[in-house]
Amino acid sequence: MPWTPQQLADASFLSLDYFVRNKPPVDQINIAHPFLQLLESSKMPFDGGKQYIVHQIYKSNDDNTAWFGSDDQVGYNNRKNIVQASFLWSNVHGGYSLTEEQLLQNGISVTDNMSVTPTREEVIQLSNILDANNMAIKEGHDAFLDYQLFLDGTQSTDAVPGLDALVSTTPTTGTVGGINRATAGNEYWRNNVNTGISTATAGNLTEAMEIEWRKCTRYGGEQPTDILVGSKFLDAYRKDAKDTVDRQIIMQGNGRTSPSMNAGVTGIFFKGVELTWCPVLDQLEADFPGSTIDWDKRCYMLNRKRLQLNPAKGQWKVPRKPPRVYDRYTHYSAMTSRFGMGITKPNTMSVLSIA
């Protein structure tokens, strides 16, 4: 027996809804998205707004504290220590269509007869088709977001500023969140940077990272939570650090240590934070060869509390089922997200690159 258009729409929507909320099939093609995972782990939804997501930024103590004698006149001032940083929010969409002819070629019949019930074979065949399409839409959505959110936002009039703008290789120029980084007095709004680091001398790269780490922790004592790197930077640091492995010791209840429990962790670490390789940085280098700062030679020291993904409430990776239009025998499924991305404390982050 065939499917009705409503049955097909319901099956498509429910399948996508289930797929998005559960682990996908084992994937052999798509690359990892550690940057997107970082953003999603600390995302902060917003209620909606006309055009911008606004953050309150404390920029100065505007202090007038001074010594005074027994009957000296003292002063008071009207402190102006808050500014607002405004970041654009926008929308992304990914969708697929299935024509009734395409479905029929796969043994699935669609009819307007409301009394029909699909056969077991049709259910299995439709499930196979939907699984493939839903995996593509979900993975495509993630790949698009991970890639685009590394860029500076100039790639499209609808794009939001990404990491290349928020943690910039030229932090003394440009406007971020409506605050001009080039203006005297706005130094607080600049991230740290060290590019063109020579790796010819052993220990030089590690020393540069030590200095940048210290800069990141200067204001408020907040340490970077994540270090994302391209493959060339990772290889350079691995050689410079001579494959150093951090070791963790677990304290037992009796106060003794037990090296046998989680005695060591694999990977390459700096200050206890693992250097995470971002494949998309290598992909960006392949897509934009000859960039002023090679993408695969970069290292980002980030603070996930201060680098924010702000989806509109209930609008992150939403499965959609647009109705079939009257003059097309085509059925649609989609996924949309509405969000912005901002930064609230650039001076806790740094971008480095090797020569």
Task: Tell what function each PLM region has.
Residues 2-355:
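Flexible, glycine/threonine- and acidic-rich loop/arm segments that mediate assembly and lattice contacts
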